């Protein structure tokens, strides 16, 4: 029996907050898991320290599925972002340990590689259409084959996805939540213009993506999807609030633009209808928020039966530990579609040294045993936690709205 003898939570803020779980076994092997929940980090810290770690000590680190079921079924209050993020951290760390003991990169334990690398997309944004296209050209020069485009909307003081620091977008900030302003009518007039200009400027050989970030009703989303059809988007993301599964049926009736959703999903029940009825094309659920590698592989297998591909969330609110875990997952599932890749800051990369690398539009997890990522605890300690909130959104008349 390979006993878990220690588990600790490490919180660090090398530019933004990250929560890491580190598990140690009786033979001295360690594994790491990401436990970051953007804007609610300390809730997961408490859940791990107060409710999970006491139950982890003494368990067999080899029994990953059993440990997963113990914490999922045994909690009674199943699911939810806090519990599933904490469970994902445990799951990642145990897979890291198992692959290290096997002396091979995790993707080999998951069935081996289904492809040579993982195609990723970057984020191009700007205050104007021209600025966004200029940023997109930079990604093309770096070899990206897929690029998400976001631009400022005329008449609105701020827009989701647009930041001053182009490569390292981070919406969360300190003190109290920033209040943004939204206008659906202004946005719907502007978005098609962005993609008309982008397709003309960037050509037909690059995949273009766009994130609505839950801002539309189903009929509005159907209209937008129809308007964007001439520009052949790879996907339209989060067109409506993700919990509105039935709403995607109405969108499907009005457009052939591919649809993606799911970064806030924590279990298959959040997307069962979407998958079974083929109401989406890409599932954005993450290793981190969907209960870890163990659970996401089950969801992906179910999606594969219905011709739905994966498109995991991969913004900078996930640490390099999740990025590494996602790449092992991506490389090993047959229905992989695309992986989001927002580059971390140099400070973050220093705290989380990793084996994964980028080349010609693709990431590869590397050949190091385990996840191929670690945490420099001494360096992490130099970046203490800083309270931060995600923004909130209001309509122009002051009504609270979806951010």
From Swiss-Prot:
GO terms for biological process: amino acid catabolic process; carbohydrate catabolic process. Gene3D superfamilies: Enolase-like C-terminal domain (3.20.20.120), Enolase-like, N-terminal domain (3.30.390.10). The keyword Transcription regulation does not apply. SUPFAM superfamilies: Enolase C-terminal domain-like (SSF51604), Enolase N-terminal domain-like (SSF54826). GO terms for molecular function: magnesium ion binding; mannonate dehydratase activity. The record marks 315 as: Important for activity and substrate specificity. Mg(2+) binds at residues 211, 237, 263. It catalyses: D-mannonate = 2-dehydro-3-deoxy-D-gluconate + H2O. Pfam families: MR_MLE_C, MR_MLE_N. It comes from the Bacteria. Its cofactor is Mg(2+). Substrate binds at residues 38, 123, 263, 284, 313, 317, 340. Pathway: Carbohydrate metabolism; pentose and glucuronate interconversion. Catalyzes the dehydration of D-mannonate. Has no detectable activity with a panel of 70 other acid sugars (in vitro). Belongs to the mandelate racemase/muconate lactonizing enzyme family. GalD subfamily. This is D-mannonate dehydratase Caul1427.
């Amino acid at each position: 029996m390979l006993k878990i003898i220690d588990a600790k939570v490490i919180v660090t803020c090398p530019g933004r907050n990250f929560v890491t779980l580190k598990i140690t076994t009786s033979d001295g092997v360690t594994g790491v898991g990401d436990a970051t929940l953007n804007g609610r980090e300390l809730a997961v810290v408490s859940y791990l320290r107060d409710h999970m770690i006491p139950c982890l000590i003494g368990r067999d680190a080899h029994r990953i599925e059993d440990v997963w079921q113990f914490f999922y079924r045994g909690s009674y209050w199943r699911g939810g972002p806090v519990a599933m993020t904490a469970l994902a951290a445990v799951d990642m760390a145990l897979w890291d340990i198992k692959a290290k003991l096997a002396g091979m990169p995790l993707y080999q334990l998951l069935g081996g590689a289904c492809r040579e690398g993982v195609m990723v997309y970057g984020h191009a944004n700007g205050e104007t259409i021209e600025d966004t296209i200029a940023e997109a050209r930079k990604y093309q020069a770096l070899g990206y084959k897929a690029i998400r485009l976001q631009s400022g909307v005329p008449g609105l003081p701020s827009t989701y996805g647009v930041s001053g620091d182009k490569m390292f977008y981070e919406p969360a900030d300190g003190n109290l939540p920033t209040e943004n302003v939204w206008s659906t009518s202004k946005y719907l007039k502007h978005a098609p213009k962005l993609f008309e200009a982008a397709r003309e400027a960037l050509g037909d050989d690059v995949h273009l993506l766009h994130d609505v970030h839950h801002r539309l009703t189903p009929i509005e989303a159907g209209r937008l999807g129809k308007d964007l059809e001439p520009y052949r988007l790879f996907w339209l993301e989060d067109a409506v609030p993700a919990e509105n599964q039935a709403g995607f049926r109405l969108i499907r009736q009005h457009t052939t633009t591919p649809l993606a959703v799911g970064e806030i999903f924590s279990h298959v029940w959040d997307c069962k209808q979407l998958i079974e009825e083929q109401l989406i094309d890409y599932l954005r659920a993450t290793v981190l928020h969907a209960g870890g590698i163990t659970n996401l592989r089950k969801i992906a297998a179910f999606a594969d039966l219905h011709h739905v591909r994966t498109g995991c969330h991969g913004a900078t609110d996930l640490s390099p530990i999740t990025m590494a875990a996602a790449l092992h997952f991506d490389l090993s599932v047959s229905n992989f579609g695309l992986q989001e890749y927002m580059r971390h800051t140099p400070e973050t990369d220093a705290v989380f040294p990793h084996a994964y690398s980028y080349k010609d539009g693709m990431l590869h997890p590397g050949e190091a045993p385990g996840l191929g990522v670690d945490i420099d605890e001494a360096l992490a300690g130099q970046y203490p936690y800083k309270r931060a909130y995600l923004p909130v959104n209001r309509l122009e008349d002051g009504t609270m709205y979806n951010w």
